Design a protein with these regions (language model features):
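S-adenosyl-L-methionine
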Residues: 2-71, 75, 81-87, 91
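Hydrophobic anchor at the start of a short beta-strand
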Residues: 96-100, 155, 189-193
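A short glycine-rich, Lys/Arg-flanked "PGG" loop and its adjoining helix->strand segment in the class I
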Residues: 145-154
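Conserved beta-strand signature within the Rossmann-like core of class I S-adenosyl-L-methionine
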Residues: 153-167
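Active-site capping/gating segments
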Residues: 171-212
Length: 212
């Protein structure tokens, strides 16, 4: 049943997946892993239910919070190929900059700036931005935390469900070890919470204690 629905999904490609991502999703639908689900599979299931994607739900949550703050200049770290999150927030009227090495194109949105570059906590100046957001930024996660802590910048970041290599080169044994390490690295600047952006999943959030 799912694979038949996938034919329609692939035709319209509502989440702007690459050819490889579509191919990988098709394989996962045919041979699902009972313990692990990809982000693309989750978005596919949400689409079947007529619900917003993970990025849309994250953006809607952030926009509701931003509306209660004075923040106008937003930096997204790790926007991915298509910078969907940044595009949504920019279209809502915020001045947004999105940085990632894999962004594939420029977008005709006046208040959206694309930086095709790597985010490094040692060199990136956050003084031009009011607030930093990131949705599962993978290897940039620790960079976001350290940059915001060092420059006293508020941030809101969802974490991947799997661990990533520390800047020291060590690999945490589990996602819980990874989350614990990040909290320790924050030196009290950040806190960890869990949010259900959709009815199918819960997401770990690392956020500054200031901001929202």
């Amino acid at each position: 049943m799912l694979i038949r629905n996938f034919s329609t999904y692939r035709q319209f490609n509502p989440h702007e997946l690459s050819k490889k991502q579509l191919s990988d999703l098709e394989k996962e639908i045919k041979h699902p892993d009972k313990d692990v689900m990809s982000d693309q599979f989750l978005d596919f299931l949400l689409w079947l239910k007529g619900l917003p994607s993970r990025q849309e739900s994250f953006a809607n949550f952030v926009l509701k919070k931003l509306a209660k703050t004075p923040y106008k200049k937003i930096l997204e770290v790790g926007g991915g190929r298509t910078a969907i999150l940044s595009r949504i927030i920019a279209k809502a009227g915020y001045e947004v900059t999105c940085i990632d090495t894999i962004i594939e194109e420029e977008f005709e949105i006046d208040n959206l700036t694309i930086l095709k570059d790597m985010f490094d906590h040692k060199t990136f100046d956050l003084s031009d931005y009011d607030f930093v957001i990131a949705q599962e930024p993978c290897d940039a996660t620790e960079h976001v935390l350290l940059a915001c802590k060092a420059q006293n910048k508020p941030f809101f970041m969802s974490l991947c469900g799997v661990p990533h290599k520390k800047l020291s080169g060590e690999m945490p044994e589990s996602y819980s070890d990874w989350y614990g390490y990040l909290l320790k690295e924050s030196d009290g600047y950040a806190k960890l919470t869990w949010i259900s952006f959709d009815p199918l999943s819960r997401t770990a959030i690392l956020k500054s204690k200031t901001g929202f």
